[in-house]
Amino acid sequence: MARLCTHTESGHYLMALDAGTGSVRAVIFDLQGKQIAVGQAEWQHLAVPDVPGSMEFDLAKNWQLACQCIRQALQKAAIPATAIAAVSACSMREGIVIYDSNGEPIWACANVDARAAHEVSELKELHDNTFEEEVYRCSGQTLALSAIPRLLWLAHHRPDIYHRASTVTMISDWMAFMLSGELAVDPSNAGTTGLLDLVTRNWKRSLLQMAGLRSDILSPVKETGTLLGHISQKAAEQCDLQAGTPVIVGGGDVQLGCLGLGVVRPAQTAVLGGTFWQQVVNLPAPVTDPNMNVRINPHVIPGMVQTESISFFTGLTMRWFRDAFCAEEKLIAERLGIDAYSLLEDMASRVPPGAHGVMPIFSDVMRFKRWYHAAPSFINLSIDPEKCNKATLFRALEENAAIVSACNLQQIAAFSGVQADSLVFAGGGSKGKLWSQILADVTGLTVHVPVVKEATALGCAIAAGVGVGIWPSLAETGEKLVRWDREHKPNPENFAVYQQAREKWQAVYQDQRALVDGGLTTSLWKAPGL
């Protein structure tokens, strides 16, 4: 039976629309930041026949799924649409949507679209091979994931789309447009196009002109947490929201996730442990890495930027290990009514720090300018089953994820001068108590784990609330609403063990990259254009 709601007046709830890589969600929060209801649907991105690397975003079908989620969330919450004070949207970064002169969305691609590899290579040769460096110094982005090569691909291969293009936005902005009929982008998400100036938080049209592309297709820029428009009558009929409800500018998923975690002040640091792991450090002013190893993104907090390093497929690697090798543990966990990862962590806790010298080779540290990884493998295995078994390999994977994170944080500190004294660990990985402790031991930092570990939707709801005056500011509200689950202090003895393990791993990984360079092994992943 649906829960009865005692608050029937307008304005007691906020809705966040969260468009992730694999699913879309509509999440309803109360004004204390508590999640009340969620509607969720998976979506698939479409590979276009004969277009290698393509991943188009199905605009018509995905809007239907978003509307389905909104209706489902309202039904689960058992509240009228008039109880929603405001709506905001967030999404995966890098995905873009193209609109024609009538404001109709005509083409879109997901963040994982890699069709423009040739265009990336072509663009790198511009300005005596300095164009990518110019893009990075201005925007904090390289060409691999930016919008510039994708627009060039459209000019080359889909001129029918390119010449009709009137506006480009991100996917979060598309959802807000479908609700309100208003087009704008925010800096945190649009920053990942490689076209936004980190200092001015506005478009750098000259970058498109340098690439020989049109510079008249850029949307207005509005800050996260400001009013975009209101729910249109058409959208109200499609998704059951109340016409006239304010629609507030949202943002990028990672930056809004940091807002929901209270990571809103200079030097605050977070490790977000999902399919990919992001290591994020807030900087008080825009600065880029002379070595171009890490990306720099606008935060949702005006005037602030974030350095962001990425560890590839960290969560996916753990899932692969569980599903490929741990069928017995999955069965036991199911019978015990616990999560299989919890059982594996319990087993791994009996393995000494350093995992008997086993070195997983999966994600490298981030090298944004020349971004590729070695072939997946385990190095330095033993044939002693007491020392080398599933528990050892599982612990080694957890340790390796922490080592890559520590290396990435070290890279950030080296060019920014910002040295963290603690970090926030969130996302699915932070559910593991052993993993949280290993992260503290490897980095030498105190690790804080929040109660709400998936905070992107909460950050989006905060933006909605600030936009209608429920809360005074993004930063103040993020700090106010975050609650902490536990704290992990680093063990100095373990830290010393991991320092040695880290040095060995870095040396071995370079040799493994050389095998990829020689064509002897296959990279875990390569950026387009390499």
From Swiss-Prot:
Top-level lineage group? Bacteria
Entry keywords, A to Z: Cytoplasm, Kinase, Transferase
Query: Gene Ontology terms, cellular component aspect?
Result: cytoplasm
The record's EC number reads 2.7.1.189
Database matches in Pfam families: FGGY_C, FGGY_N
Q: What is its main location?
A: cytoplasm
User: Where found?
Assistant: Cytoplasm
Family the UniProt entry places it in: Belongs to the FGGY kinase family.
- Sum up the protein's function in the record's words: Catalyzes the phosphorylation of autoinducer-2 (AI-2) to phospho-AI-2, which subsequently inactivates the transcriptional regulator LsrR and leads to the transcription of the lsr operon. Phosphorylates the ring-open form of (S)-4,5-dihydroxypentane-2,3-dione (DPD), which is the precursor to all AI-2 signaling molecules, at the C5 position.
Task: Return the protein name.
Answer: Autoinducer-2 kinase
What gene makes this protein?
lsrK
